[in-house]
């Protein structure tokens, strides 16, 4: 397990990285800034494992892994996991937590484009959760993910739809009213409509397999997957 450094390429937003660097030490605080990620992780993991036909014995790449919440959980399922992120502090937190947990994850600090140039076609599963809305060129990330997965392999994306409801729910509600995430975490202008994401996907070797919404109920304080992609959504694609 390591946390290598590498040169930065064009597709990096240093202000976005700084946001997560500032709160990296709280990544594994179940009641802290990343509480929502811990809450939705079982749903994400279950969706990925089910759609990919299980994770045991598979080689998996988690793009934009942050502090390693999803990466660790996939490793616990028996996958060989590499976590990729451009934030140095989140990767250090991820590396330390994996050591404390006895979980083997290989953490690398480089962009997905750089990784794709060296490791094309090497992964059974690639995940890219809540990362596309934090980079200048999300289409470039989609292309790189397509290059990294093996023929017949699975690629999963999750992001936020761009509309009035998602602004109210993800920005006004989550950041300012419920204070579920730090203020300034999201910029609605960077949210991605499903049609836009699918438009990028069809320009690669990937094919859409399934899409689902991720829904939060503030009354019951619960999350669930289901129809409706007007706020958070997940997309399963497969390499042709």
From Swiss-Prot:
This is Ubiquinone biosynthesis O-methyltransferase. It is an enzyme of class 2 (transferase). S-adenosyl-L-methionine binds at residues 44, 64, 85, 129. PANTHER family: METHYLTRANSFERASE, UBIQUINONE BIOSYNTHESIS O-METHYLTRANSFERASE, MITOCHONDRIAL. It catalyses: a 3-demethylubiquinol + S-adenosyl-L-methionine = a ubiquinol + S-adenosyl-L-homocysteine + H(+); a 3-(all-trans-polyprenyl)benzene-1,2-diol + S-adenosyl-L-methionine = a 2-methoxy-6-(all-trans-polyprenyl)phenol + S-adenosyl-L-homocysteine + H(+). Keywords: Methyltransferase, S-adenosyl-L-methionine, Transferase, Ubiquinone biosynthesis. It comes from Escherichia coli O6:H1 (strain CFT073 / ATCC 700928 / UPEC). The gene is ubiG. Disulfide bonds: none annotated.
């Amino acid at each position: 397990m390591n946390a290598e450094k590498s040169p930065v390429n064009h597709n990096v937003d240093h202000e976005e990285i700084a946001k997560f660097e500032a709160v990296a030490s709280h990544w594994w605080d179940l009641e802290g800034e990343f509480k929502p990620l811990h809450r939705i992780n079982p749903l994400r993991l279950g969706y990925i494992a089910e759609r990919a036909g299980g994770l045991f014995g598979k080689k998996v790449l988690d793009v934009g892994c942050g502090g390693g919440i999803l990466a660790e959980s996939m490793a616990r399922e028996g996958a060989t996991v590499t976590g990729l992120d451009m934030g140095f502090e989140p990767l250090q937190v991820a590396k330390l937590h994996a050591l404390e947990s006895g979980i083997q994850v290989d953490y690398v600090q480089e962009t997905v484009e750089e990784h794709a140039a060296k490791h094309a076609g090497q992964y059974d599963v690639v995940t890219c959760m809540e990362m596309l809305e934090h980079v200048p060129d999300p289409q470039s990330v989609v292309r790189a993910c397509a290059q990294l997965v093996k023929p017949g392999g699975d690629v999963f994306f999750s992001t936020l739809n761009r509309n009035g409801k998602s602004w109210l729910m993800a920005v006004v509600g989550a950041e300012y009213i419920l204070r579920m995430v730090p203020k300034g975490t999201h910029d609605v202008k960077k949210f991605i409509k499903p049609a836009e994401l699918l438009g990028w996907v069809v320009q690669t070797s990937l094919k859409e397999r399934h899409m689902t919404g991720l829904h939060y109920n503030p009354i019951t304080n619960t999350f669930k997957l289901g129809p409706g992609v007007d706020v958070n959504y997940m997309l399963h694609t497969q390499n042709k």
